[in-house]
């Protein structure tokens, strides 16, 4: 069977070969993620070109995602490169410039002394080392180590519960976004989203450049969970980024947040990616743990559009095996059922009602496929959220829409000429599906489109059609 859940792979040092990137595409990579927290522009340009070449060579749609670093807060550098903070020690984190020593080190967040208050927690290196703020003395935040461990240059800091006032887009992010858009990426992920207004800052940069692409909100902060519905509505897609989320929130809350975010995204026809440590042990080992296999399976059962591999493919020893393993797990779950938790949302929009009706007609008539003509991808996403067992085929004249739909559940997208009439649409369906050799004359399909063609948001037509028959 054809896999319906999509796979996002992070590119990095482990994937710096043309043949390996092509192998990843052939194994099931649907979206290639470029992580702008690492690498330089030359690295990203080469990676981008590798993906485009592999996509063209294999005929598979592969989207390219630029993941912006966001206002990531880090320690500065230590004179010795590293040290070990023991429980009970006092350490100072300063917003001033200094050469780091064992008990005093700088931070990239220059408002820390203004935002911190006694009792705040400071977590270093994804929570491996924990501090509590005792006092603020000038530029220094004085802390006590409550959970000790090794620390080294540029380790990340999380500040759960602190009212952090860093901007949603740093200067680096603006430069990276400009580069990525000019390069031609298909979508952008914004890190550490806190408010629905954060997307407006990204759109301002996009509008200056003259190119808008979908923006994915990475859910990593408690504020994002508090504003979840508004963020889902404002952004084009969401990513449940469980790494930082698991540091900022109690661990036991993360699975429930994941399920809630997936359901809310589906209710609003927004793609949702589940990320972080899906097959983490495969960074070092050729096989995942049983718990990781269950984690992947449960994300599929929750209704996620796509699952993401991070270190497994960017720096891991077995990137190709990781993709193949994830694909096998997804397929095994889908062989049992493509169903997801039922949607409670009752559509009240024209496109929402039409998508439900097309799904119902197709399933009751035992159609061979649902076919949707789309200019923006919206109608296809509304169909995809229903998790129909019927194949979902998207026809578009826009290559960027084909690439963007690569992260949407169950969607196979084809580039077709711009249509001038509904009769032309139906003839194109016959031509394309017969060329696939998976369909034959007389097979029943349900077509969803807008009439007259050529207007975004004009979906108003459902046509029940037998391939090759003159019913136009």
UniProtKB/Swiss-Prot annotation:
Subunit organization: Homotetramer.
This protein's name: Pyruvate kinase
One Gene Ontology cellular component annotation held by this UniProt entry: plasma membrane
Alphabetized UniProt keyword annotations: ATP-binding, Glycolysis, Kinase, Magnesium, Metal-binding, Nucleotide-binding, Phosphoprotein, Potassium, Pyruvate, Transferase
Name of encoding gene: pyk
Residues the record lists as binding ATP: 35-38, 74, 155
Swiss-Prot/TrEMBL cofactor(s): Mg(2+); K(+)
Phosphoserine: modified positions: 37
GO molecular function, one term: kinase activity
One of the Pfam families matching this protein, by short name: PK_C
Pathway: Carbohydrate degradation; glycolysis; pyruvate from D-glyceraldehyde 3-phosphate: step 5/5
Gene source species: Mycobacterium tuberculosis (strain ATCC 25618 / H37Rv)
PTM comment, free text: Phosphorylated by PknJ. Dephosphorylated by PstP.
EC number(s) recorded for this UniProt protein: 2.7.1.40
Biological processes, Gene Ontology terms: glycolytic process
Site (Transition state stabilizer): 218
Sites where the protein binds substrate: 33, 243-244, 276
Protein family according to the UniProt entry: Belongs to the pyruvate kinase family.
NCBIfam families: PRK05826.1, PRK06247.1, PRK06354.1, pyruv_kin
Reactions catalysed, as given in the entry: pyruvate + ATP = phosphoenolpyruvate + ADP + H(+)
Residues reported in the UniProt entry to bind K(+): 35, 37, 67
InterPro entries, A to Z: Pyr_Knase, Pyrv/PenolPyrv_kinase-like_dom, Pyrv_kinase-like_dom_sf, Pyrv_Knase-like_insert_dom_sf, Pyrv_Knase_AS, Pyrv_Knase_brl, Pyrv_Knase_C, Pyrv_Knase_C_sf
Positions that bind Mg(2+): 220, 244
């Amino acid at each position: 069977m054809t896999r319906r859940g999509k796979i996002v792979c992070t590119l990095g040092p482990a994937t710096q070969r043309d043949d390996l990137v092509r192998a990843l595409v052939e194994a099931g990579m649907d979206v290639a993620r470029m992580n702008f927290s690492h690498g330089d522009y030359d690295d990203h340009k080469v990676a981008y070109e590798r993906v485009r070449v592999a996509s063209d060579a294999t005929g598979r749609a592969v989207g390219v995602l630029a993941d912006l670093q966001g206002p990531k807060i880090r320690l500065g550098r230590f004179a010795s490169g590293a040290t070990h903070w023991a429980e009970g020690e006092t350490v100072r984190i300063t917003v001033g410039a200094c050469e780091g020593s064992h008990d005093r080190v700088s931070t990239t967040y220059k408002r820390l002394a203004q935002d911190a208050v006694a009792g705040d927690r400071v977590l270093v290196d994804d929570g491996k080392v924990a501090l509590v703020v005792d006092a603020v003395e000038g530029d220094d935040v004085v802390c006590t180590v409550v959970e000790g461990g090794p620390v080294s240059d540029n380790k990340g800091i999380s500040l759960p519960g602190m009212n952090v006032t860093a901007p949603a887009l740093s200067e680096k992010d603006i430069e990276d976004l400009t580069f990525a858009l000019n390069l031609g990426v298909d979508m952008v992920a914004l890190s550490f989203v806190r408010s629905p207004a954060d997307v407006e800052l990204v759109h301002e940069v996009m509008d200056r450049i003259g190119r808008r692409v979908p923006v994915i909100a990475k859910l990593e902060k408690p504020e994002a969970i508090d504003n979840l519905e508004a963020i889902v509505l404002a952004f084009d897609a969401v990513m449940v980024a469980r790494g930082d989320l698991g540091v900022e929130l109690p661990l036991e809350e993360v699975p429930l947040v994941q399920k809630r975010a997936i359901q809310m995204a589906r209710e609003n026809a927004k793609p949702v990616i589940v990320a972080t440590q899906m097959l983490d042990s495969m960074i070092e080992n050729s096989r995942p743990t049983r718990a990781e296999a269950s984690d992947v399976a449960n994300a599929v059962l929750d209704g996620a559009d796509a699952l993401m591999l991070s270190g497994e493919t960017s720096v891991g020893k077995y990137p190709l095996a990781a993709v193949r393993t994830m694909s096998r797990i997804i397929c095994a779950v889908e062989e049992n059922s493509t169903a997801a938790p039922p949607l409670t949302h009752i559509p009240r929009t024209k496109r929402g009602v039409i998508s439900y009706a097309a799904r119902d007609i197709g399933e009751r008539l035992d159609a061979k496929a649902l076919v949707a003509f789309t200019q923006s991808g919206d109608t296809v996403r509304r169909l995809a959220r229903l998790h129909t067992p019927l194949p979902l085929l998207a026809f578009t004249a826009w290559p960027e829409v084909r690439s963007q739909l690569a992260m949407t559940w169950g969607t196979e997208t084809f580039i077709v000429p711009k249509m001038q009439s509904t009769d032309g649409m139906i003839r194109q369906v016959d031509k394309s599906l017969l060329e696939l050799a998976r369909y034959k004359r007389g097979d029943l399909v349900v077509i969803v489109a807008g009439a007259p063609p050529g207007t975004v948001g004009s979906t108003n037509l459902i046509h029940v059609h037998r391939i090759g028959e003159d019913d136009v």
